């Protein structure tokens, strides 16, 4: 069985593998416009470079070529027949015509054949208004049909594939985009074709749910209305929606998204193209958890009265906090601020400045991590240095204490992409997981990592041109965090290929959107655990427990959802979610990006930094900024790169080398406890207050279960 899998695996690599990049360019003429393009490119790519749009259904520049819709036919001089432009590589001197009468007739024929069996569902189809078939039919379709089959049009039973994707298979035109995406990109080969010709159907063959955290992308890829969003079904038309370009903050990748709203309600979330970050994909949590923005929201200030909360005005709530602070009069570290996963940089710096102005340095995040293991003095020690896009250049990868499929689903597709297209070898140390690529597990603890780096894996990493070590954020939560960072630092400092020119092969994969900005701003001041906090300020902090909150402490919770953190509070202040404010975030690779307000916050909720600024006056510690621009100037004072958006601040080779040595020196006294590393996320669909409040994510839990794990003794499941 294993040999069969290995044979199929090798075959799939040969099938998917792309030829190496050619520097040579050829000159092509498209509709009279001469363009130079890389040899090996297709005619349709040359046409796009020339500014000519060729209609297509099956072609997608992020998927393998299929060439089965024939809509992209073009006329090439000295060729007897029309050519499918998506599948034909360019040749030097080629002359292409894309809009002749001959081509128009061919496209009209293709359109007529597609519409032959297509139902007239446009009035009730969710794809209406943004449907490729609808648009091309207006240009190439006829006002009447010639189909007179006695038995009527083809009828196909709809497939039940889960709570996220709604199927209307009568509309399917067999472009196979969904099949190629699920097999090649998502790594979940559950979609395929059965039958031939008019009898061909697309589905799962044996009826089952699509179990992938990237399945929603087939909705965007479908050029007709065969696959649509089940939670969004029949809720709105595209021309009714206001579109806002922003970013996702439900993980640390920072996927570029578009938020569509109607009134104050977020109707849907779609991906935006950014080849450096998420290409054209987003995870199902990013796409479908937006209904959590409507439930369990905090809309007005609340003050605890016994076992109940009572509504209050802003003045009453802030006055109550000021009175409690004055009564407690916390000294030094007795005032503590804890920030959560979704907090923007402006709010972090505002809270830090307020706490510092009140005489305390006790600021931290809500995930118990040993920051001292990697520190926050040298930035290259806590970001993803190779960059997300740089993963495609890697030729050897070692994963340490991470499951990228859950922690960064979009980044995981990059690893699979390069694994399919090359002879990339991937090893892991830590808890085993159901990967979408072939990975060799070397053990579960720091001792296994030590052995791996001293053995054949270490030898391969040392000989690789661009090696990659990815350390998961969960490592900092283990007893062996210091020992692991010491081992990684020692190994990297001994091998020049880990720090050569623009390449730094040591990477930390975060899972929280606020984490890198918090480290950049120093929002992790180390205060002795013996210091008992008497006044605690929770800023969107919901990953805390009873042990983190002393019984006699006064607690203020500021956030946008009534989750765990709010249950500890004496006073609750309603803040804004990421779709309701303009905020700065830094993703795991150190790229600074910003959210934009797509709608207004509900009730009397306000932006977080404004709440903190107002509170500072009540506490007689007025902060020196009155608008968002002043706050961002303050960000620039502390960390200048935080005001330069969509760029990654480069770390010099010399600084990176100092960083490796710092990992060793900082942890030189570390001992190995041999505690097994655990993946920090075992429930992909419930990782933050928004997803935990989402009815759609709850349905996913009900359908798929909390975990997508395999049996320990089973051979790793290879998807190809």
Curated annotation (Swiss-Prot):
Phenotype on disruption: Leads to sensitivity to both cell-wall damaging agents calcofluor white and Congo red, as well as to thermosensitivity. Also increases the sensitivity to oxidative stress agents H(2)O(2) and menadione. Impairs the yeast to hypha transition. Causes significantly less damage to host oral epithelial cells.
Subunit text: Core subunit of respiratory chain NADH dehydrogenase (Complex I) which is composed of 45 different subunits. This is the largest subunit of complex I and it is a component of the iron-sulfur (IP) fragment of the enzyme.
InterPro entries, per the entry: 2Fe-2S_ferredoxin-like_sf, 2Fe-2S_ferredoxin-type, Mopterin_OxRdtase, Mopterin_OxRdtase_4Fe-4S_dom, NADH_UbQ_OxRdtase_75kDa_su_CS, NADH_UbQ_OxRdtase_ferredoxin, NADH_UbQ_OxRdtase_Gsu, NADH_UbQ_OxRdtase_Gsu_4Fe4S-bd
Localisation: Mitochondrion
GO BP terms in the entry: ATP synthesis coupled electron transport
Gene Ontology MF term list: 4 iron, 4 sulfur cluster binding; metal ion binding; NADH dehydrogenase (ubiquinone) activity
Top-level taxonomic group: Eukaryota
Similarity field: Belongs to the complex I 75 kDa subunit family.
Keyword Transcription in annotation: no
Binding site for [2Fe-2S] cluster: 58, 69, 72, 86
Residues annotated as domain 4Fe-4S His(Cys)3-ligated-type: 102-141
Induction conditions: Expression is repressed in the presence of nitric oxide.
Cofactors that this protein relies on: [2Fe-2S] cluster; [4Fe-4S] cluster
Function: Core subunit of the mitochondrial membrane respiratory chain NADH dehydrogenase (Complex I) which catalyzes electron transfer from NADH through the respiratory chain, using ubiquinone as an electron acceptor. Essential for catalysing the entry and efficient transfer of electrons within complex I. Plays a key role in the assembly and stability of complex I and participates in the association of complex I with ubiquinol-cytochrome reductase complex (Complex III) to form supercomplexes.
Pfam families with a match to the protein in the record: Fer2_4, Fer4_NDSU1, Fer4_Nqo3, Molybdopterin, NADH-G_4Fe-4S_3, NADH_dhqG_C
Organelle targeting sequence: 1-23
Reactions it catalyzes: a ubiquinone + NADH + 5 H(+)(in) = a ubiquinol + NAD(+) + 4 H(+)(out)
Name of protein: NADH-ubiquinone oxidoreductase 78 kDa subunit, mitochondrial
Domain spans labelled 4Fe-4S Mo/W bis-MGD-type: 241-297
UniProt cofactor note: Binds 1 [2Fe-2S] cluster per subunit. Binds 2 [4Fe-4S] clusters per subunit.
Keywords: 4Fe-4S, Electron transport, Iron, Iron-sulfur, Metal-binding, Mitochondrion, NAD, Oxidoreductase, Respiratory chain, Transit peptide, Translocase, Transport, Ubiquinone, Virulence
2Fe-2S ferredoxin-type domain segment(s): 24-102
Coiled coil: none
Enzyme Commission designation: 7.1.1.2
Assigned GO CC terms: membrane; mitochondrion
């Amino acid at each position: 069985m294993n040999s069969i899998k290995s044979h199929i695996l090798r075959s799939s690599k040969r099938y998917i593998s792309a030829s190496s990049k050619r520097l040579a360019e050829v000159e092509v003429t498209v509709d009279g416009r001469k363009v130079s393009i890389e040899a090996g490119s297709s005619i349709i790519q040359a046409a796009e470079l020339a500014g000519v749009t060729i209609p297509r259904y099956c072609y997608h520049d992020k998927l393998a070529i299929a060439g089965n819709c024939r809509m992209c036919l073009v006329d090439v001089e000295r060729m007897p027949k029309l050519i499918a432009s998506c599948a034909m590589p360019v040749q030097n001197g080629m002359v292409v015509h894309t809009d002749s009468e001959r081509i128009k007739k061919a496209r009209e024929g293709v359109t007529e054949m597609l519409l032959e069996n297509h139902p007239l569902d446009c009035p009730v189809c969710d794809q209406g208004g943004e449907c490729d078939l609808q648009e091309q039919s207006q240009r190439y379709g006829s006002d009447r049909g010639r189909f007179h089959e006695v038995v009527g049009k083809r009828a196909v039973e709809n497939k039940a594939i889960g709570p996220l994707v709604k199927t209307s298979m009568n509309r399917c035109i067999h472009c196979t985009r969904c099949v190629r995406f699920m097999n090649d990109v998502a790594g979940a080969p559950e979609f395929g074709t059965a039958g031939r010709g008019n009898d061909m159907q697309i589905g799962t063959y044996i009826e089952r749910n699509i179990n992938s955290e990237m399945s929603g992308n087939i909705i965007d890829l479908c050029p007709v209305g065969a696959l649509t969003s089940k939670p969004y079904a029949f809720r709105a038309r595209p021309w009714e929606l206001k579109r806002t370009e922003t970013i996702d903050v439900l993980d640390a990748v920072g996927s570029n998204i578009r938020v569509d709203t109607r009134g104050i309600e977020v109707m849907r979330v779609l991906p935006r193209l950014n080849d450096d970050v998420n290409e054209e994909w987003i995870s199902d949590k990013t796409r479908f958890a937006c209904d959590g923005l409507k439930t369990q929201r905090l809309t007005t200030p609340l003050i605890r009265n016994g076992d109940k909360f009572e509504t209050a005005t802003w003045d009453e709530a802030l006055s109550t906090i000021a009175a409690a602070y004055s009564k407690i009069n916390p000294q030094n570290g007795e005032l503590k601020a804890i920030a959560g996963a979704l907090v923007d940089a402006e709010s972090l710096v505002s809270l830090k400045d307020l706490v510092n102005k009140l005489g305390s340095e006790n600021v931290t995040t809500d995930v118990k991590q040993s920051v001292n293991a990697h520190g926050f003095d040298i930035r290259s020690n806590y970001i993803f240095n190779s960059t997300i896009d740089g993963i495609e250049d890697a030729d050897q990868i070692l994963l340490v204490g991470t499951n990228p499929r859950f922690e960064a689903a979009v980044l995981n597709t990059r690893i699979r992409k390069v694994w399919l297209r090359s002879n990339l070898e991937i090893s892991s140390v830590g808890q085993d997981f159901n990967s979408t690529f072939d990975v060799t597990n070397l053990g579960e603890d720091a001792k296994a990592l030590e052995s791996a780096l001293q053995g054949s894996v270490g030898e391969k990493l040392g000989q690789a041109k661009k090696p990659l070590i990815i350390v998961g954020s969960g490592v900092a939560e283990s007893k062996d965090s210091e020992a692991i960072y010491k081992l990684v630092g020692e190994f990297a400092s001994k091998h020049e290929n880990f720090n050569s020119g623009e390449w730094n092969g040591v990477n930390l994969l975060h899972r929280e959107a606020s984490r890198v900005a918090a480290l950049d701003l120093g929002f992790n001041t180390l205060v002795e655990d013996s210091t008992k906090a008497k006044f605690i300020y929770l800023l969107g902090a919901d990953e805390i427990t009873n042990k983190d909150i002393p019984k006699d402490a006064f607690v203020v919770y500021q956030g946008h959802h009534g989750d765990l953190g709010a249950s500890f509070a004496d006073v609750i202040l309603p803040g804004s979610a990421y779709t309701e404010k303009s905020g700065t975030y830094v993703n795991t690779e150190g790229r600074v990006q910003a959210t934009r307000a797509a709608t207004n916050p509900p009730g009397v909720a306000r932006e977080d930094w404004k709440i903190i600024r107002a509170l500072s006056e009540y506490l007689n510690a007025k902060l020196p900024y009155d608008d968002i621009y002043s706050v961002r100037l303050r960000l620039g004072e502390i960390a200048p790169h935080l005001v330069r958006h969509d760029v990654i601040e480069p770390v010099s080779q010399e600084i990176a080398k100092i960083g490796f040595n710092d990992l060793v020196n900082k942890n030189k006294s570390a001992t190995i406890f041999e505690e097994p590393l655990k993946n920090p996320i075992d429930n992909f669909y419930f990782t933050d207050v928004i997803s935990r409040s989402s009815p759609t994510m709850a349905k996913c839990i009900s359908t798929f279960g909390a975990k997508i794990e395999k049996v320990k003794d089973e051979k790793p499941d290879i998807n190809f």
